[in-house]
């Protein structure tokens, strides 16, 4: 598992300098695996478990005094041609100088990948996270030294660092979809995807160089055939670029997005070997084997099938689940991830490919945004009426029921739908007050990617919005022994930028979710797979798991940290999580996330796996 840790301090401060040297020695003494990637005046970067061409350090060597740095992660050269395969970067002295003299802008303009850059120019220090932020960057501090890191167990091992839970952030995550840009630990923050932090003796400034809104207005592709050809070329070239360092991989195949991904991976030249892995449930809504088998047979790819069995509630210890910056599943996911790791080892594979981000980037949503965007950019023209009919069919609603909102939003002020709350009767009234105060504080600062600028349309804001919340992140909730690298081509910069340049009504070609992607890859997949309309509803597995372990969950939660902090109502838990009581679906759906938050909170407060076992809940 590749990871890094960086220290930034004011080199003119003797006490901070002494502390920085103490921290460096602490980590190198803990393990000889920690190596120095960069050591400058007030900036030091350590890393470990480097694999050249996969995850490594790229030196920013300028040969100038007090100027230089390093990029950690995976960096590829940019080529604006959609069919061009990118190569692993090698940064020359002139290129390093350009990166540093542009305060990192050149890194975003000339390269792409999964990386964090640390560099300096005189007393100014910079931390730059790639636009997708899949290699996380967290920050804490100690005695005048800023500490940046990617894997929390590394800093948690330092007993002199104290961490405490930020309960309002936890509360918000129980009601709204989790925003991984906020860390529920008081002493930690997360550097956002695409954010550049400039640290000077006078203070800190945060900037975003990558501008997705501007991309939506640049070289727009409205012709369906051209868009289809460009999307296909980009996905094929990107997948080939990402697969290049590996000889074998598993594609986590299930839905249409991962089937298209498998079709692209099947084009990667030998000696690359591909295997499919499909996890299915007994419930028909969670079983996609009919389509998966067709795809694998058509492409000649061997398939591993894994049945998701409902198991007894078991809390896995630190040997399976490390301490994480956010609540994570301690029950089901660790065993499944170990299963994937073991299968990858068996076949001699080295990496997992995952279709995450396909729903959002290839665009599958049956909303009105495609019609609204067309109306705002083209006005009332003949294609508008076809688009209205397609939107009606996708939403399974009448034209007359969607037309008023289309007219209102098409001619009115730009806006997007607010994220809906998901409260349950198990939460206390205090939680809502806590969450509202937290939301009001957050709403004072709108993320620059979501501000209506650059003549951007509401649909393109909806297209961009999932990228800001950090939902797509490296598998940090894994111990190094079971770690496997996961690559997500749909969340790579070349694919994202291509999709952003294509209007939504073109992405929804033929009035179908991912319609353009279907058209682009229809010759590589069986027709039944290309034109399938069903999608797995895997949530029923967790309902079954919750029902099977209801007594243990009730016992765990009733006297737990979430009750003690006033987030969950003990009386409601006792009444609702009872097999003799009819449980509402909304209450049922939240229980598993409450259990994850409870176990995480106990671990954060110092409880060990053995403590939880002794409490008779595991």
Predicted regions and their residues:
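Structural motif
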Residues: 106, 163-168, 450-462, 512, ...
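Acidic, carboxylate-rich catalytic segments that either coordinate divalent cations
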Residues: 559-618
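Short amphipathic alpha-helical segments and their helix-coil junctions
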Residues: 95-98, 157, 445-454, 500, ...
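PAPS-dependent sulfotransferase catalytic core
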Residues: 527-584
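ATP-dependent adenylate-handling active sites, centered on carboxylate activation for C-N bond formation
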Residues: 1, 5-17, 123-137, 141-143, ...
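Short, motif-level signal for alpha-helix interfacial/capping segments enriched in acidic residues
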Residues: 111, 233-234, 334, 468-473, ...
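Short, hydrophobic/amphipathic alpha-helical patches that form generic packing surfaces
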Residues: 168-179, 462-473, 477, 589-606
